[in-house]
């Protein structure tokens, strides 16, 4: 089964169709996962008004419970094993912020969707490698796969392709897919400096990771391109084919 547009249309979760009082489980409480939790907790009332129903965190899973995350876990169940989040009958939505295309994140995605739980992820690698399988699994179990944050973080690229441009024939997709590469290439072009020197500057400024291969080897951009191609053209294009 390919990444057809219809599968991704159905996979995107429409909040207004969900039952009242949504119970949420979050897997992964790093920088991004913790911020998701803080937003859900600190803006609980505003979000309930905005979406028309309560969004309540009932369970989380992460590596280290002792880390100070600037929000209370007192009324939230903790699991060392993320897979257990998919077994809770009261959980409506599982939010995955673990990362990685295989392993724990993929197992959790499969288990959650198989049990009819809606699945939200920012994991571009997993969607790029396994999007067809997960979208098909979501459809088969009347669940919804949401991955807006996996591409162009603060820009609603998925929603735009799914809804705003649904009546258009898209012939071309272009854009800056990786900020680290864009910074490095721009500096090399304008200053004439070599790659290693500009990369070191990017790392010092926080634009590049200490281990930058995911960005500079094109892996991150390839993952994003696989997702955008699927959404824009309904094509079955895997990461390995790019």
Identify the meaning behind each predicted range.
Residues 13-115:
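N-terminal glycine-/serine-/threonine-rich beta1-alpha1-beta2 phosphate-ribose binding loop
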Residues 171-174, 182-185, 189, 201, ...:
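Catalytic, metal-anchored helix/loop core of enzyme active sites in primary metabolism
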Residues 27, 31, 35, 80, ...:
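Conserved active-site and cofactor/substrate-binding residues in soluble primary-metabolism enzymes
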Residues 103-115, 124-151, 158-162:
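Rossmann-fold NAD(P)-binding glycine/threonine-rich loop
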Residues 157-170, 181-193, 223-237:
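Oxidoreductase and adenylate-handling cofactor-binding alpha/beta cores
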Residues 197-242:
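Substrate-binding/catalytic subdomain of NAD(P)-dependent oxidoreductase enzymes
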């Amino acid at each position: 089964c390919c990444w057809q547009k219809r599968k991704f249309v159905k996979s995107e979760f429409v909040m207004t169709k969900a039952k009242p009082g949504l119970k949420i489980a979050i897997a992964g409480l790093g920088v991004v996962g913790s911020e998701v939790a803080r937003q859900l907790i600190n803006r609980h009332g505003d979000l309930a008004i905005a979406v028309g129903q309560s969004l309540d965190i009932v369970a989380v899973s992460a590596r280290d419970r002792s880390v100070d995350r600037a929000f209370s876990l007192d009324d939230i169940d903790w699991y060392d094993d993320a897979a257990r989040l998919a077994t809770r009958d009261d959980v409506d939505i599982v939010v995955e912020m673990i990362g990685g295309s295989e392993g724990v994140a993929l197992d959790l995605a499969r288990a959650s969707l198989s049990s009819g739980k809606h699945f939200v992820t920012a994991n571009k690698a997993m969607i790029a490698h396994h999007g067809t399988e997960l979208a098909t699994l979501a459809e088969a179990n009347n669940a919804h796969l949401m991955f807006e944050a996996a591409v162009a973080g603060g820009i609603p690229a998925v929603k735009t392709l799914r809804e705003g441009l649904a009546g258009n024939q898209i012939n071309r997709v272009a854009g800056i897919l990786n900020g680290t590469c864009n910074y490095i290439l721009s500096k090399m072009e304008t200053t004439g400096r070599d790659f290693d020197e500009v990369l070191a500057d990017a790392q010092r400024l926080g634009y590049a990771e200490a281990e930058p291969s995911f960005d500079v080897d094109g892996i991150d951009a390839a993952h994003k391109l696989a997702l955008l191609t699927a959404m824009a053209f309904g094509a079955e294009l895997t990461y390995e084919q790019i």
